[in-house]
Amino acid sequence: RILISADALWERGFGVVFPELEGDDAFDELGETLDLIESLAPATVIPGHGAVFTEVDKAIAIARERLNGFLANPAKHTRHAAKVLLKFKLLEVQSLPYAAFIAWVQATPYFRMMFDRHLSGPDFGQWIDELVAELVRSGAAIREGLVIRNAG
């Protein structure tokens, strides 16, 4: 049996749960989706991202562990989602002045919504700087002087 899973199951996780960021209790629905996938017992999964895989039980276990981590610490999911959106922008533009990148973030209401709804601690600008630094540390972006570039 073959399952085309889109973002519901990847070999090492799943996609960002955007409804959860917007205030819906969508982590429960994701858990139910993983239960359904498990009950279907697919032999092969074609994910929305990454290679086709056959170790479905292992992938489900990884996804459940990741989901449990997000349930225990929803701010972790928010940080992950924000970095995904930053990376998508870098994939789109490849390179741009850092000031323009930050201006884009500040002008994008979704980032402010995520910050206001899910986080406490640093101010918004500091949070964005931390996210960008994490992208650079992970090799997903490169800062060269006044420019930020896509990497990886």
Regions found by a protein language model. Give the residues of each.
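Metallo-beta-lactamase
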Residues: 1-71
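C-terminal regulatory/interaction regions
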Residues: 78-152
